[in-house]
């Protein structure tokens, strides 16, 4: 019998395994992944102030790229922010986990049932453990009302250097389509870029062929000559408007959860790495790793996060439900004009009361009446439950 089985080899469970291996190298754990490698095909990014110095230290071997700042671009605002920005690639992530866990990673392994102390594989085999953590990604739930962040990114090698020294996190000078749209660009080397077309949309419908064309068009508009496509990634992330966190957890009683499965992501940006790191630390610090204490720990962690993020869900309702779709960029342009510490605390999910007042006061970027109606539009019974 294993001490711990982690079902799903994505970011959250991978970081839990990585941290536990650092802290407790003799722990008998197993990571089960349905795909061909842990981490799938993704790029996870985060801001310098999202993590503590200690967290930066234990995560450092996984970081593939680091920059001293980043830029944002809007029709009436162009700004460079001077705080660090970092990215982990799924290739680096998988390599590190294989080195740390060895044969304790099972790939191409489908699971049919997850219980607090056991896992049943698709072939019928049953595995027992002191605890099981379900980290198989986001699942559709009637307990949540969401918008969506849709994206397609392509990693291109260029014919010549691109000249970028820092990422462009948002270029919203592009034509606005399907809600709020921007292009996200990471300079991975002197002649390699990850270019990602992103839309905040009301429905989870993504036209990949159209997005491939817009990525190509954007590169050409910048004078970047594309030589070789090295990789492509796609995604559809939930952007939470309102919901009931207790109902979200009710469909699998007693089973500890992690990551998107637990509702652990930034409600507005969709970033999930900072919370995955924090949960990994909390689990590694726990004196007991049985199913009951881990269920209590992970559920309480998720519920605390939910209660703290009500302001972000309010902002999301204003972004998705107020004003014309083609003008939603104005909300983000106004936000990025705020003082840099406020922007960094926003990404870290640690806004002060003064920060919240800064965001809500001043000339509204969407019609005031519509903004307040959207802010008060709760789901499903006009109570945003914590």
Curated annotation (Swiss-Prot):
Keyword Iron-sulfur in annotation: no
GO BP of this protein: carotenoid biosynthetic process
Binding site for NAD(+): 3-33
Database matches in InterPro entries: CrtY, FAD/NAD-bd_sf, Lycopene_cyclase_b/e
Domain of life: Bacteria
Required cofactor names: FAD
Protein name, UniProt field: Lycopene beta-cyclase
Originating organism: Pseudescherichia vulneris
Lineage, broadest ranks: Bacteria, Pseudomonadati, Pseudomonadota, Gammaproteobacteria, Enterobacterales
């Amino acid at each position: 019998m294993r001490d711990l089985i982690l079902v799903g080899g994505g970011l959250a469970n991978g970081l839990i395994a990585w941290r536990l291996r650092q802290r407790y190298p003799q722990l008998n754990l197993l990571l089960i992944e349905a795909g061909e490698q842990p981490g799938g095909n993704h790029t996870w990014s985060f801001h310098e102030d999202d993590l503590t110095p200690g967290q930066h230290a234990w995560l450092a071997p996984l970081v593939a790229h680091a920059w001293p700042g980043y830029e944002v671009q809007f029709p009436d605002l162009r700004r460079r922010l001077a705080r660090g920005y970092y990215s982990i690639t799924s290739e680096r992530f998988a390599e590190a986990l294989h080195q740390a866990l060895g044969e304790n990673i099972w790939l191409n392994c489908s699971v049919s049932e997850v219980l607090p102390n056991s896992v049943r594989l698709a072939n019928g085999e049953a595995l027992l453990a002191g605890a099981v953590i379900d980290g198989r990604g986001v699942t559709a739930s009637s307990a949540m009302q969401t918008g969506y962040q849709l994206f397609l990114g392509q990693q291109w090698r260029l014919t010549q250097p691109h000249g970028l020294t820092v990422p462009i996190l948002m270029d919203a000078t592009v034509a606005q389509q399907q809600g709020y749209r921007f292009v996200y660009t990471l300079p991975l080397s002197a002649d390699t870029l990850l270019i990602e077309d992103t839309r905040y949309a009301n429905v989870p419908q993504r036209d990949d062929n159209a997005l491939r064309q817009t990525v190509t068009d954007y590169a050409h508009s910048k004078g970047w000559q594309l030589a070789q496509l090295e990789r492509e990634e796609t995604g559809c992330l939930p952007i939470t408007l309102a919901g009931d966190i207790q109902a979200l957890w009710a469909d699998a009683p007693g089973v500890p959860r992690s990551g998107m499965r637990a509702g652990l992501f930034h409600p507005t940006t969709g970033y999930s790495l900072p919370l995955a790191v924090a949960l990994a630390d909390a689990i590694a610090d726990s004196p007991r790793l049985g199913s009951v204490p881990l269920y209590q720990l992970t559920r309480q962690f998720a519920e605390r996060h939910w209660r703290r993020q009500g302001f972000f869900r309010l902002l999301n309702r204003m972004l998705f439900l107020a004003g014309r779709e083609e003008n939603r960029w104005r909300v983000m342009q106004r936000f990025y004009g705020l003082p840099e510490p406020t922007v960094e605390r926003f990404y870290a999910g640690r806004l002060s009361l003064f920060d919240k007042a800064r965001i809500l006061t001043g000339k509204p970027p969407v019609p005031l009446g519509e903004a307040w109606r959207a802010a008060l539009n709760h789901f499903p019974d006009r109570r945003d439950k914590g």
